[in-house]
Regions:
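Outer membrane beta-barrel strand-and-loop segments of large Gram-negative receptors
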Residues: 403, 442, 446-450, 542-546, ...
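Transmembrane beta-barrel wall of Gram-negative outer-membrane proteins
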Residues: 261-291, 302-341, 349-373, 408-415
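Surface-exposed extracellular loop regions of Gram-negative outer-membrane beta-barrel proteins
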Residues: 382, 427, 472, 492-552, ...
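C-terminal beta-signal and adjacent terminal beta-strands/loops
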Residues: 677-711, 723-731, 735-786
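Gram-negative outer-membrane beta-barrel transporters
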Residues: 456, 572-575, 587, 594-683
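A beta-strand signature from Gram-negative outer-membrane beta-barrel systems
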Residues: 167-168, 212-253, 264-266, 273-275
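Periplasm-facing N-terminal accessory domains of Gram-negative outer-membrane beta-barrel systems
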Residues: 34-123, 127
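Periplasmic N-terminal accessory/gating domains of Gram-negative outer-membrane beta-barrel systems
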Residues: 101-106, 123, 127, 131-228, ...
Length: 786
């Protein structure tokens, strides 16, 4: 169905609202470019050409001051005419100053290249974080930088984003082997992952301990666990916005790493060296490959009783070329191919691939104070599960997305607005436990526009925003207002609040009742959906659309105990007003012959509602050589399926994460890190007994004396009314760097599950066999940089 065809079914009022938003956004550019004096530009590293993030930029003799963003861009607006000294300072780079003559109504561009300097470890990040906390609402957001990844003991000695995510507030992992990440009551499909603006449909490998991203190419990752502004949409729980860095524009560099779990290679360098006026062309290439299935048979044959080791394999390739211009405008083109394969004892074979290409760009108009960013991308994701004596399961997503974002600084205030288009074709085919086919093929396109205004007014920071979302396949228009507020009660105490409406039109083939299910398929806007839902009050609620929807309310405070000790407390409520789940109760085909059969027995998908609430407490300390991160999370997730309230399999009541990293030695060349995790037991459905189902294939003529069934029936207890034992695990690592000439060798040793805690993963109901999560796994890794 095309956009024009869908428009025929949208109401006149909805089309007028959407058209009005588009017109308003289009008119913002000239309105915001009115005659003012503006000083803007980019700050980059003189050594590599990379952006200098979070540098302080100020005009001496005035109240004007800002920080550079993750692209190194700064903009000082509403500057009165006159002569000033422009001062740039950074904890990582040597500062610079320049006398500038600001003319009334003129826009002045000044780009700077800063030289690196020796700094105290962590001081730059501490300073940048403190600045961010006093100028932005920053509700339920955690920023992960490359330096943060190294502070967490890593599985196999190689830092990985997924291991950093697991220690963030609100994150729950259901297992070391095939577990998924759940964020503040939201399931994995309700979490959007963006790579340089591109939607990544499966960002984590089946083993659950590795992501598809190479930590060496990550520049910054912003993780929003709720209450995010209108800039982001299409998901109802969380956003992970990951940015990659450009290759070195001055010299060729490389990195080779090996461990018992896998190997990786990173190469980067200039295709056209960075000149004195900027510009330049660079590349960066990354390749990761796991050989864990082979090495685990020798080194970790004790993991499984059959000695087969760990049956997980994956390969990730990524490449990027960046073109820069003298005025700071930039174009980057990238491509990737991620693959994953799991082979369980020759009984099942699961594999998926995710390949795509895209680009992003930054445009700095010479006569405007507006910064324009854009992205475009297309990808294909396919997953297939083959099992003995069962039909194959298959799912695919062919998708594209395009977006434009505009940013304008109004003194200490900021306006952001933009447009986004997302399209996808989904194909999904599977079978339930009794062999009934469940599947659908869909095409959908989403159109969105947003306006985000951040107001800094004394002690108040107010961030209202509005997102207009149109789902063309179902002709559904949704205005989604959002708000963020922060009040600076004192120099050390800041109170904050956020709320908003959210929606999405994509679901997962997994049910939230599945304990383990590596088959992760996608479907957009399912049509075979029940049309009535019995509410907890006994009323029948009509289901008039297939969207998943939610409301967020989050409040909390930040308190600076000292200059390096910070306390952050947040309480959250996510009201999931409509959820879609795979129907595990389907017994009949949905056709005219079965029209009298209840919908819950013939529809492919069912509708649920839910509520998630809890609180997260984060205590952080960081100085030159010591890093400490302590998180306690309390959470409660309840779902209503039209029959009962139940706890989904990821409903963990208590969760604790402690990370400690300590530099040792005169030059702090040694670093010791530890992570301890404690989680209360997850829900599961208990087995009450077994029975032999009667065989009545011949109806009333069946001879019940001899017609015994060969099948085994299971009598279940209440849905997820039981609780597994508590989970806890200690990981340790130690690393040391050796430098000579232009080479660095990093040696690290570590262990996962140091005291080999037997954490239960699941129990086979029929055989009673218990499957535990990963035992004690030691490792040594080498990393050579040149």
């Amino acid at each position: 169905m095309t956009w024009v065809e869908c428009g025929k079914f949208a109401s006149m009022q909805e089309r007028r609202c959407l058209a009005g938003l588009m017109l308003t956004i289009a008119l913002m550019c000239p309105l915001l470019s009115w005659s003012q004096a503006t000083v803007k530009g980019f700050i980059r590293s003189k050594d590599s050409g990379e952006p200098v993030m979070f540098a302080s930029v100020a005009l001496e003799g005035s109240s004007r001051g800002v920080m550079s963003d993750i692209e190194g861009f700064y903009s000082l607006t509403r500057v009165p005419a006159g002569q000033y000294t422009l001062v740039i300072s950074s904890m990582e780079f040597e500062g610079v100053s320049e006398v500038v003559d600001v003319l009334d109504g003129k826009i002045m561009t000044r780009n700077y290249f800063l030289e690196s300097k020796v700094i105290q470890l962590g001081s730059a990040e501490v300073n940048a974080d403190r600045q961010e906390q006093t100028t932005k609402v920053n509700m339920s957001i955690e920023t992960i930088r490359p330096s943060d990844l190294k502070k967490i003991p890593s599985f196999g000695g190689s830092p990985d984003l997924v291991q950093a995510l697991q220690v963030l507030p609100g994150f729950i992992s259901t297992g070391d082997q095939g577990g998924q990440l759940y964020i503040r009551g939201g399931s994995p499909i309700q979490n959007k992952v963006l790579l340089d603006g591109m939607i990544i449909y499966n960002a984590f490998h089946s083993i659950g301990l590795f992501s598809v991203f190479d930590s060496d190419v990550i520049a910054n990752a912003d993780v929003y666990t709720g209450g995010f502004s209108a800039k982001f949409g299409g998901r109802i729980s969380s956003i992970m916005d990951i940015k990659t860095r450009d290759g070195n524009k001055k010299k060729i560099q490389g990195r080779v790493g090996v461990s018992p779990f896998g190997a990786k290679l990173t190469l980067e360098g200039p295709l056209k060296k960075l000149g004195t006026g900027g510009g330049g062309i660079s590349y960066i290439l990354s390749l990761k490959h796991s050989y864990l299935e082979q090495t685990s048979k020798v080194l970790y044959d004790y993991v499984n009783e059959d000695g087969r080791g760990l049956p997980f394999n994956f390969t990730d390739a990524y490449g990027k070329v960046s073109f820069g211009s003298g005025n700071g405008s930039k174009l980057s083109l990238f491509g990737f191919n991620f693959s994953d394969r799991v082979n369980y004892q020759a009984l099942s074979d699961l594999g998926w691939t995710n390949a795509g290409a895209g680009g992003n760009f930054t445009v700095v108009p010479a006569g405007s104070a507006i910064l324009m960013n854009g992205h475009f991308a297309a990808s294909n994701y396919e997953i297939r599960l083959q099992e003995e004596e069962l039909e194959d399961r298959f799912s695919s997503v062919n998708g594209f997305n395009f977006g434009l974002d505009f940013k304008y600084m109004l003194g200490e205030n900021a306006v952001e607005y933009g447009l986004e288009v997302v399209g996808m074709e989904t194909d999904f085919q599977t079978f339930n436990s009794i062999g009934v086919q469940v599947g659908q093929k869909e095409n959908t396109t989403e159109f969105a526009g947003y306006l985000d205004y951040r107001i800094n007014n004394g002690d108040w920071i107010i961030n209202p925003s509005m997102r207009m979302q149109y789902y063309s396949s179902i002709a559904r228009f949704r205005p989604e207002p959002r708000i963020g507020i922060k009040y600076k009660a004192s120099e050390r105490l800041r109170l904050k609040l956020a709320a908003g409406l959210y929606s999405q039109n994509v679901i997962s083939s997994n049910s939230d009742r599945d304990v383990v299910n590596l088959f992760y398929g996608f479907l957009a806007g399912p049509e075979n959906l029940q049309r009535n839902l019995l509410t907890p009050s006994g009323e029948v609620q009509e289901v008039n659309h297939s969207l998943q929807t939610a409301q967020h309310v989050i409040s909390g405070f930040e308190f600076d105990l000292t200059e390096r000790f910070n306390l952050n407390v947040e309480g959250y409520l996510k009201n999931f007003t409509q959820l879609t789940n795979a129907n595990r109760n389907k017994l009949f085909e949905d056709n005219a012959d079965n029209a009298d059969v209840p919908e819950v027995l013939r529809k492919d998908f069912i509708v649920e509602t839910g509520i998630a609430y809890g609180a997260d407490v984060v205590l952080k300390y960081e100085d030159r050589s010591t890093y400490m991160w302590l998180v306690y999370g309390y959470g409660n997730v309840d779902r209503w399926d039209g029959f009962r309230w139940y706890d989904p399999v990821f409903d963990r009541r208590h969760n604790v994460n402690l990370v400690v990293s300590q530099g040792l030695g005169k030059d702090k060349a040694w670093e010791v890190s530890a992570r301890w995790n404690l989680g209360s037991g997850l829900p599961f459905t208990q087995t009450q007994g077994f029975f032999q189902p009667p065989n009545v294939v011949d109806g009333i003529a069946t001879d019940y004396v001899v017609a015994n069934s060969e099948e085994l029936g299971i009598q279940f207890a209440g849905l997820n009314e039981g609780r597994l034992p508590a989970y806890h695990r200690l990981d340790l690592s130690i690393r040391r760097e050796f430098e000579w000439e232009n080479h660095t060798l990093e040696c690290s040793a570590g262990a996962t599950n140091v005291y080999s805690r037997d954490n239960v993963f699941y129990v086979n109901r029929v055989t009673g066999e218990r499957v535990d999560q990963l035992p004690f796994l030691p490792s040594i890794s080498l990393d050579w940089r040149f």
